[in-house]
């Protein structure tokens, strides 16, 4: 059977999961399968020929936004790419979720132009979305309206929905997952286990990950976190301390968490502004201890490096809606990701 698999992505972390899917396909019987990717993120996975890659522009400023509105560069490139895809017996479209203009537009509209009578929609892992049924309760919430308006202006229509962001249209037939046992199945017919390649870590540094929702923690709470970090530092034999701010925080003066930990006595922090995926960055800096505010990056790090690293989280009940907190606790417990208070209180 002549088959194609089309991956859609918009973050470097998603491209890491796509790479793991590709590695899975290489180990299975996929001789007659062509791999394609449409992405606006860097670090395109290996194993996809240049002619099967479409690199879209990530809109990060007003100038790029105006180009998409008036010239519709991404939309034009996408339509041309879809038109160039030959006929296949089966085409599988792999997305992380549908809370994104590209994924929504491609599945709901571009897929109709693909030359195949058998179109399959699949999910690949993206943080916690494989393990919690995160939902949009109203299709008219403000963020959804912004996406609809942005899609309309750029020529890539976004379909409003309410329901689980991973499968709002009940169209997913296949799910790729690192932990099938606790994966939300939705209406899928098959859950396929993928995995990270085995990697050896060298180093004893500490890696602290920043978060985007700064308002979730007040100054008093951050002071308590500082005490716990200080206690951890007093009990661990470590080299250097690295801090990676969240990509959406451009000005470090707006990073309240970072400004807070700078006040820890005698602490010396090295900043990582690299856009390299956290999983790859960890190897280059040689970190074995990770601290973060329930960052889903810790899930991938634990899956990849297992007992070579220790992960500690804080702020679960403040950062995550109570409805989903139990799902986080389940995954964190499964992977031995511990609250910062344990065993440092």
Where are these regions (language model features)?
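Conserved catalytic-core segment of nucleotide-activated headgroup transferases in glycan assembly
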Residues: 206-252
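Nucleotide-activated donor-dependent transferases that construct or modify glycoconjugates
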Residues: 2-11, 207-211
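Active-site regions of enzymes building and remodeling cell-envelope glycoconjugates
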Residues: 47-65, 139-146, 189-191, 204-205, ...
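Catalytic binding pocket for nucleotide-activated donors in carbohydrate/polymer assembly enzymes
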Residues: 297-345
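Structural motif
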Residues: 3-6, 90-94, 205, 240, ...
């Amino acid at each position: 059977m002549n088959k194609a698999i089309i991956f859609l992505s918009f973050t470097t972390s998603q491209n890491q999961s796509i790479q793991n899917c590709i590695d899975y396909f290489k180990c299975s019987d996929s001789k007659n399968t062509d791999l394609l990717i449409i992405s606006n993120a860097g670090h395109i996975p290996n194993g996809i020929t240049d002619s099967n890659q479409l690199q879209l522009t990530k809109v990060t400023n007003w100038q790029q936004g105006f180009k998409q509105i008036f010239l519709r560069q991404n939309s034009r490139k996408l339509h041309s790419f879809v038109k160039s895809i030959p006929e296949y017996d089966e085409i599988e479209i792999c997305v992380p979720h549908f809370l994104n203009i590209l994924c929504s537009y491609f599945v709901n509209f571009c897929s109709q132009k693909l030359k195949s009578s058998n179109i399959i929609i699949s999910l690949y892992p993206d943080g916690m979305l494989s393990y919690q049924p995160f939902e949009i309760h109203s299709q008219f919430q403000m963020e959804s309206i912004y996406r609809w308006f942005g899609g309309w202006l750029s020529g890539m229509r976004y379909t409003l929905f309410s329901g689980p962001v991973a499968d709002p249209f009940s169209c997913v037939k296949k799910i790729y997952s690192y932990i099938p046992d606790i994966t939300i199945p939705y209406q899928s017919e098959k859950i396929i286990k993928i995995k990270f390649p085995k990697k050896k870590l060298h180093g004893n540094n500490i890696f602290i990950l920043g978060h985007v929702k700064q308002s979730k923690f007040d100054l008093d709470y951050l002071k308590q976190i500082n005490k716990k970090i200080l206690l951890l530092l007093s009990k661990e034999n470590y080299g250097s301390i690295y801090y990676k701010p969240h990509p959406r925080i451009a000005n470090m003066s707006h990073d309240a968490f970072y400004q807070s930990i700078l006040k820890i006595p005698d602490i010396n922090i090295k900043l990582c502004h690299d856009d390299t995926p956290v999983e790859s960055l960890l190897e280059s800096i040689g970190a074995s201890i990770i601290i973060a505010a329930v960052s889903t990056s810790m899930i991938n790090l634990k899956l990849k490096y297992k007992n070579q690293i220790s992960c500690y989280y804080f702020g679960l009940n403040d950062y995550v809606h109570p409805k989903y907190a139990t799902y986080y606790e389940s995954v964190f417990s499964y992977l031995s990701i511990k609250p910062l208070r344990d065993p440092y209180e």
